[in-house]
Amino acid sequence: MFGVNDYIVYRNNVCYIKEIIEIKDKKYYVLFPIDDDSLTIKVPVDNSFIRRVISKDEVAEIIKNIINIDIIKVDNEKMIEQEYKKLLENATHENLIKIIKTSYLRNAKRKREKKKISEKDDTYFKLAEKILYNEFSVALKMNYEDTKKYVVDSVEKGYKDE
């Protein structure tokens, strides 16, 4: 069981536990998502969608392996959104990185070709980034923007070292 002021991940939200309450002989966490002060979530303490925030060492290991995570390949361009949605349903760190890498590279290619970026790719890129970097920022004890810069710099360094 987690305690008051602990950070946890509930579904795709990084939250802190404001308090633990009891309603009809059942304990509940009162959660506040770190990116939405106006939202309060009450969930039973035994909810299967709650997990701990990863550690700093786990973040480092994930960053080290980003280079090895494949992008999404689709035969039919119209299927990309379905792939993004499928990966978000099971938003593992690897799945989020697949979305980020794929959408980033697809839009970078469009920019090089002087084409308009895809709103669909951009939307999923931002959503996957938000989910991933919110958790990383708690694990690294950094703000969101510094976390994003740290990850990008680390990945770029990894590609240069290859």
Residue ranges and their predicted role:
Residues M1-R51:
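A positional/architectural concept
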Residues S55-E162:
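Charge/polar-rich, low-complexity and marginally structured segments
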